[in-house]
Amino acid sequence: MSNIRRQSIISSVVIYIGFAVGLLNTYFFTRQGTRFTEADYGLTTIFIAIATMMAAFAAMAMPSYIFKFHPYYNEHLPPKKNDMITRALLVSTIGFVLVVIAGWAMKHLVIRKFGTNSPQLVAYYYWIFPMGFGLTLYTVLEAYAWSLHKSVVTNFFREVQWRLFTTVLIVLFITNTIKDFDLFIKLFAFTYPGIAVSLFAYLFFTKQIHFTFKVSKVSRRFLKKIIALCSFVYGGVLIFTISKVFDTIVIASLLNDGAAKAGIFGLATIMTSIIQAPQRGIISASVSHLSKAWKDKNMPLLQKIYQRSSINLLIFACAIFLLIWMNFADGITTFGVKPVYLSGAWIFFILGVTTIIDMGTGVN
């Protein structure tokens, strides 16, 4: 439990550093006098939403497979004969190929649904695919790293490095080094592939990742259970992910000037994510311990983790929510953010309440 506490605290600090960088990015996107329009900022949020949905479809529940079965692979196989990450990356890559085929076939639908209210999305539609592929690979590698108790490292790449990549692009755009938004959004599409390469390089050079295409005895033994688990979890993951991003996509599709409205919604979403930082840290730190506890049927440890995480996260969520809600309008005015973003206050309120309820369930 002490190891979980230590890793979750460090992870939370790293995540909040990332949020600080993210808030700086948001300020550059939304401040008065910026080169970015509301539609430009909205397009970046739409890119992230669709890339997240692509990754959920493509990953084929491989992160859940890693979380559940890594203790068995780790216990019964030497590292160089462990084929888990090879299988997971291969299946996810095949899954993304299917996503690309489906995305290409649905281009006419995208034009029909988004052409009027979000023409920017139609213009840059194919540039979402590199972003989605990068996030797919990162999600699988992240799950593997969590199982190796490397949650702090993965949180640094996802929360800090990814936002620093964005910061660099923003600064280059503001200083006119990047001449137009066309180049900016195309480079932005490669930020997720960038952190995927970084995490892979870390695992490779620290000799914590090995590839083998020979089917191991563990894979053969648990094949039916692996398929059953992934089949069961896959639908739940899709529903959960779609519920997180569907609102952004619907706003971009149905509302007049949808990309700009998605930007306003995106600001409220970012403020809501500040509340979730401790939850992300605790989940990433505890997943490997929960997997081991379930394998060993260690019910006292499971009860301790779930109970303590629920109480601590609920208290923290309520406190941060109240602080942000009471100062939302003043913050917009004080920092010189465009007044149009004040309309996101009640969006934050609704999303914040749902986040409090979610965090009250602990690491579930």
Name the predicted role of every residue range.
Residues M1-I4, T177-L187, L199-K244, H289-K304:
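Interhelical loop/hinge segments that connect adjacent transmembrane helices in multipass membrane
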Residues N3-S64, F96, V100-W104, M131, ...:
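Signature of the first transmembrane helix
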Residues R5-I9, T45, P78-I94, Y125, ...:
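Interfacial transmembrane-helix starts/ends
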Residues E38, K107-I128, A259, I324-G362:
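Interfacial segments at transmembrane-helix termini and the short loops linking adjacent helices
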Residues I48-A56, G236, F240, K244, ...:
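Transmembrane helix-bundle signature of multi-pass secondary active exporters and lipid flippases
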Residues A59-E75, S147, A268, T272-S310:
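Helix-loop junctions and terminal segments of transmembrane helices
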Residues Y126, F156-Q208, T269-T272:
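Hydrophobic alpha-helical transmembrane segments
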Residues G134-R158, G352-N364:
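Membrane-interface junctions at transmembrane-helix termini in multi-pass inner-membrane proteins
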